[in-house]
Amino acid sequence: MPFGPASRLGVSLFDETPPVEWVPGRSQEEAETIIRAIYRQVLGNAYVMESERLAVPESQFKRGELSVREFVRAVAKSELYRSRFFTSCARYRAIELNFRHLLGRPPLDLEEMRSHSTILDTQGFEAEIDSYIDGDEYQSTFGENIVPYIRGYKTEALQSMVQFTHTFQLVRGASSSSLKGDLSGKAPKLNALVIQSTPTAVISPASAGATFSTPPTGARTRLGVDASAGGKVYRIEVTGYRAKTFNNISKFRRSNQVFLVPYEKLSQEYQRIHQQGGVIASITPV
């Protein structure tokens, strides 16, 4: 089942749209619908110009020479995909996006990230793409003729809370794209979180704190003692620091900041943040 109201989390479209499956022999119009769905998923919801479309694989698919799985492979190995999500992105960002585009989920753990990094080192880009599409998970989930789709936004048996929350880091709503709809852009988004197996707050894309993006570790600030009398410390994620400007230049070096605050100082810190124009994205116990 979806976690919380699907519309608030930006996944209602995923939840309401059944998997798209191709049945060979259907009309050209239906084939075109499948092709558009594949471009949308594999290219991360990005706009594809007519001149960028893959004319030869499209024609082969319409003639029944390629299955959905093989057309997905053709798109993922294309120069269009390579230029957008591989050569222009940091390595671990490219791997994160491969998981999103080809398996519809975030990477499980550090070991999974390392194994794909090793494939890139030893066998190259095309072998990395094949490792997803030829894997047992792809075959058992999508088979030969189901278009890959976003998964992981529903709570399921054996799914870790880390993987569940990381899904919402990779997918910021059904209308967002892999790069332009994400503040991380081409930099790794999950790398440090996966290494430390750290779950993240699930923030609605429509909320005031939706613009929060985790800053570098060095940007974290610990206020006061290490813990309260009860031993509790809370992590406050803040975004939107735009107040207190001089000549249109903010006094804050970063618009996104993280504070570690003892319980006794939560109220005081809450007031300070709002006085300075910040928006609290989340408050979670550490």
From Swiss-Prot:
Induction: By green light. It is a peripheral membrane protein. The keyword Amino-acid biosynthesis does not apply. GO terms for biological process: photosynthesis. SMART domains: CpcD. Residues 231-286 form the CpcD-like domain. GO terms for cellular component: phycobilisome; plasma membrane-derived thylakoid membrane. Keywords: Antenna complex, Membrane, Photosynthesis, Phycobilisome, Thylakoid. Signal peptide: none annotated. The keyword Thylakoid applies. It holds the Pfam family PBS_linker_poly. Residues 2-179 form the PBS-linker domain. It comes from the Bacteria. Transmembrane segments: none annotated. InterPro entries: CpcD-like_dom, PBS_linker_dom, PBS_linker_sf, Phycobilisome. It is found in: Cellular thylakoid membrane. The phycobilisome is a hemidiscoidal structure that is composed of two distinct substructures: a core complex and six rods radiating from the core. Belongs to the phycobilisome linker protein family. Rod linker protein, associated with phycoerythrocyanin. Linker polypeptides determine the state of aggregation and the location of the disk-shaped phycobiliprotein units within the phycobilisome and modulate their spectroscopic properties in order to mediate a directed and optimal energy transfer. This is Phycobilisome 31.8 kDa linker polypeptide, phycoerythrin-associated, rod. The gene is cpeC.
